[in-house]
A protein has these predicted regions:
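Active-site-proximal segment of RNA-dependent polymerases
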Residues: 5-57
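Conserved polymerase palm-domain catalytic core
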Residues: 47-136, 140-169
């Protein structure tokens, strides 16, 4: 984004999105600000699954591009802003009706917007007594049972239900 737009996006990130950090799923390991009390990164993501016998990893195709204007609008609306403010915030944070790569707001918005998908995966993980985490666009489930694990169909069903596509390459 242009430098003036980027400055405004940083303001939105620091003054709106970071104040809603508690709404990010505890299973989201990517795009988290550094915090000595709650360190979440690619290493902590891998550690969650290190002792598991099996592991399933699914990459979401075109992650930011898949998060549309309407989802961003809905997120800001839920924060209680008036419609005009929601419109402006959404326009500041999207480009061509999607979350743009490289915008300071996109990573945190993605974490906040996909909370319902994270919750659905936590439910699936609980059902199969396994571990779930998401690092940015990478979904990981792991466990120790030799016979019980979620099927790819179960996983894809959640991905598709939240308007994403798995990268099957």
């Amino acid at each position: 984004p242009y430098s003036d737009l980027k400055r405004v996006q940083r303001w939105v990130y620091e003054n709106i999105l970071l104040k809603d950090l508690s709404s990010v799923s505890p299973c989201a390991e990517g795009f988290m600000p550094k915090d000595k009390d709650d360190i979440r990164n690619i290493v902590t993501n891998a550690r969650r699954h290190a002792r598991s016998k099996w592991l399933i990893n699914v990459d979401i195709q075109d992650f930011f591009d898949s998060i549309k204007y309407d989802s961003v609008w809905e997120y800001f609306s839920k924060l209680g802003y008036e419609e005009e403010v929601v419109d402006v915030l959404t326009k500041i944070c999207t480009y061509q009706f999607r979350l743009p790569q490289g915008a300071p707001t996109s990573p945190m918005l993605s974490n906040l917007i996909v909370r319902s998908m994270d919750d659905a995966f936590v439910e699936l993980a609980d059902k199969f007594n396994c571990i779930y985490s998401r690092y940015a666009d990478d979904i990981t489930l792991s466990g120790n049972s030799d016979s019980i694990m979620p099927s790819m169909r179960d996983i894809y069903q959640i991905v598709y239900a939240h308007h994403f596509r798995p990268n099957k390459k």
